[in-house]
Amino acid sequence: MKNKSNIFYSRIVSYVAVAVLLIAISGWIKIPLPIPITFQFATIALLCFLLGEYCTVAVSVYIVMGLIGLPVFAEGGGFSYVLNPTFGYLLGFLVGSFVCGKICTFGDVSTRLKPKRMITAVGIFFVFVYLTGTVYGICIFNFYVEANADFWYLMTVFVFNTLWKDVILCFVIIPLAKKLVPLIGLKK
């Protein structure tokens, strides 16, 4: 029994390492706007389906790597990145991946792949990421940068610029997750 447990945890460590790499790569592929559009949202949402709550470990490792100075974030790295308005999205990824991962791994594989559950999981992930990212970004703009920008301008910068892309990608990752979870998803 102990050998089977060791194999399971070895797989988790391997999957988490690959997940950190995928998160970093998806952050580097970006469309340059005031808030760069990356593919991290879709990548992390897909990883939630595949890894469950272990996706939170991958996101945590990614954030720690960036904060200690490795240039893994979309705009570099280092501890000063916490003053970047986009850092709130990374915090949202952390909390959202935990909640979404728990939803995605509750029950057996056939229950996890029901469309209603998958849409709910991605929707909750969406809310956590955008709520945390937007509130954090507005706070940084108003209290650190002292920009005193208009509310609707900030909503355009933090929400409306990227919202459409993430909604479209949600419709892509759900069918992709339905195919990949039975193949490589963690089974408890």
Residue ranges: model-predicted function:
Residues 8-19, 37-44, 55, 85, ...:
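Residue-level signature of transmembrane alpha-helical entry/exit and packing/kink sites
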Residues 26-37, 63-96:
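Interfacial aromatic-anchored transmembrane helix boundaries in multi-pass membrane proteins
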Residues 2-3, 11-12, 18, 25, ...:
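Short helix-perturbing small/polar motifs within transmembrane alpha-helices
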Residues 58-62, 69-73, 96, 100, ...:
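Alpha-helical transmembrane segments and their lipid-water interface positions
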Residues 26-31, 65, 100, 104-108, ...:
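Membrane-water interface at transmembrane helix exits
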Residues 113-188:
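Membrane-embedded alpha-helical hairpins and interfacial helices in multi-pass inner-membrane proteins
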Residues 30-42, 63-71, 104-119, 180:
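Hydrophobic alpha-helical transmembrane segments
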Residues 2-59, 68:
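Hydrophobic transmembrane alpha-helices
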